[in-house]
């Protein structure tokens, strides 16, 4: 299985500043020119919500302050400017190879 290592496990960011979350895969999640890495946001008591698909594509309805980048094994989620409603846990997920796997999550606190 592909192992996804997220960092940091938690972070606290001041309102209006930038939050950066990294995800490193144990092997490439690229195939035929696309990177099969996705990012999710989960708030307590709610199901995960897709933010970014295929590394850098913004899901419909997601604010443009969320952005994703990377390819191969190294990926980044950026949130800027951070808003209070962004307090949540964020997960990377690869969909290149079965079984699809998730990172362990990053909890974002807004200061």
Curated annotation (Swiss-Prot):
Residues 54-60 are annotated as: Complementarity-determining-2. Keywords: Adaptive immunity, Disulfide bond, Immunity, Immunoglobulin. InterPro entries: Ig-like_dom, Ig-like_dom_sf, Ig-like_fold, Ig_sub, Ig_V-set, IgV_Light_Chain. Residues 61-92 are annotated as: Framework-3. Gene3D superfamilies: Immunoglobulins. Residues 1-23 are annotated as: Framework-1. It holds the Pfam family V-set. CDD domains: IgV_L_kappa. The keyword Disulfide bond applies. Disulfide bonds join 23-92. One of its GO terms (biological process) is immune response. Residues 93-101 are annotated as: Complementarity-determining-3. GO terms for cellular component: immunoglobulin complex. The keyword Transport does not apply. This is Ig kappa chain V-III region PC 7769. It comes from Mus musculus.
């Amino acid at each position: 299985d592909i192992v996804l290592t997220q960092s940091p496990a938690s972070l606290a960011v001041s309102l209006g500043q930038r939050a950066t979350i990294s995800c490193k895969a144990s092997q490439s999640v690229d195939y035929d020119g696309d990177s099969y890495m996705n990012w999710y946001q989960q708030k307590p008591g709610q199901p995960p919500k897709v933010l970014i698909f295929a590394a850098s594509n913004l899901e419909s309805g997601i604010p443009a302050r969320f952005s994703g980048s990377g390819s191969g094994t190294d990926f980044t989620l950026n949130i800027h400017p951070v808003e209070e409603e962004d307090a949540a846990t964020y997960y990377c997920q690869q969909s290149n190879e079965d079984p699809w796997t998730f990172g362990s999550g990053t909890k974002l606190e807004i200061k």
